[in-house]
A protein has these predicted regions:
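Short, small-residue-biased leader/transition segments that mark boundaries at the very start
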Residues: 1-4
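Short conserved micro-motifs at the rims of enzyme active sites and ligand-binding pockets
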Residues: 29-32, 78-79
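C-terminal accessory extensions/subdomains outside the catalytic/core fold
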Residues: 74-122
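Short glycine/proline-enriched loop/turn "hinge" motifs that connect secondary-structure elements
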Residues: 7-13
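Beta-strand elements of well-folded, non-transmembrane domains
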Residues: 20-26
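Short, conserved secondary-structure transition motifs
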Residues: 50-81
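Long, well-ordered alpha-helical scaffolding segments within enzyme catalytic domains
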Residues: 33-52
Length: 122
């Protein structure tokens, strides 16, 4: 067969953006999920690739965790509006991306909705 059909595609660098949420009302009512559990979850997300060094994910790492905290268990703002405050842009558009430093990640923390705060972990 054709040798090119057997070669793996190599992407020199990729940046994944993930979003998620925790429902405090469901956690309180059904699971007993606590603030301590939440902190363990944040630590797990930050370190989830430390012991997962397969050939296809050799250098994966969590680079930044942006946490939006609400004063109310029912939330103080829609999650999609908060996610829109996180911006990722190329430092040198048009130049090949080779590392995390080729991106600029910013969080707009001005005029936050009442009852919302931001924590950033790196």
């Amino acid at each position: 067969g054709d040798v090119y059909k057997r070669q793996k595609l190599i992407i020199p660098y990729g940046l994944f953006v993930c979003t998620g949420s925790v429902s405090p009302t469901l956690a309180q009512k059904y699971t007993g999920f606590s603030e301590e559990d939440l902190n363990l979850l944040w630590d797990a997300i930050m370190n989830m690739f430390d012991f997962d060094k397969s050939a296809c994910r050799a250098e994966m790492a969590t680079r930044k965790l942006v946490i939006f905290k609400h004063d109310s268990i029912y939330g103080n703002a829609p999650s999609h509006k908060l996610y829109e405050r996180v911006h990722v842009k190329e430092v040198n558009p048009g130049k090949p991306i080779r590392s995390f430093s080729d991106y600029e990640v910013t969080v707009n923390d001005t005029d936050l909705p009442a009852g919302v705060s931001i924590e950033v972990r790196e």
